[in-house]
Amino acid sequence: MKKILILSLLFISGWMSAQAVDLNKENRDPEYVKSIVSRSQKIVDKLGLTDAKTAEDVRNVIANRYFELNDIYEVRDAKVKKVKESGLTGEAKNEALKAAEDEKDAALYRSHFAFPANLSLFLDEKQIEAVKDGMTYGVVKVTYDSHLDMIPTLKEEEKAQIYAWLIEA
C-alpha cells in the first residue's frame, strides 16, 4: 500500500510539473498583454534558463502574476469610484472606502504565497528571489543599501534581519 501511495504521488507531481502554464490573456487589451509579456521575458532572460519550455512557463507565471495584481487593483478602483459617485458622505463614505481597501489587501494576501509556489515548480530559491527582484526593479538592493547607509552601526545579525524582511516583503 505504501509503495502504491508513493508511486501515485510521484506520478501526480510529475504530471503537474509537466503541465504547461497558460498565459491568462483572455479579455485583455492585446497591447497590454504584449507589454507584460515583454517585461516578463526580460526578467526570465536574466535567469539564464537553458530549457525553452521552462523559460516560457516561468515567463507565463510572471506575466499571470502581473495580470492578477492588475485585476485586484482594477476591482478596488471600480469600488472606490462607485463609492465616490454614490453620494455617500462622512463616516459612511470613509467606511466604504476602507472596505474597498481591506478587500484589496485580503486579495493580495491570498495571492501572495501562490506566486512563489508556482515559480518553485520551475526555479530554485535563488532564481525565485531574482524574479521578485526583477519585478520590483531591484528595490530590495536599493532599500537594503539605503538602510546600511542610514544606520552604519548595524550588527551583522541586524543586517541579515533587515535583508530577510525586505526579501519577504
Q: What are the roles of these predicted feature ranges?
A:
Residues 19-169:
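Charge-rich (acidic/polar
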Residues 1-26:
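Bacterial Sec-dependent N-terminal signal peptides
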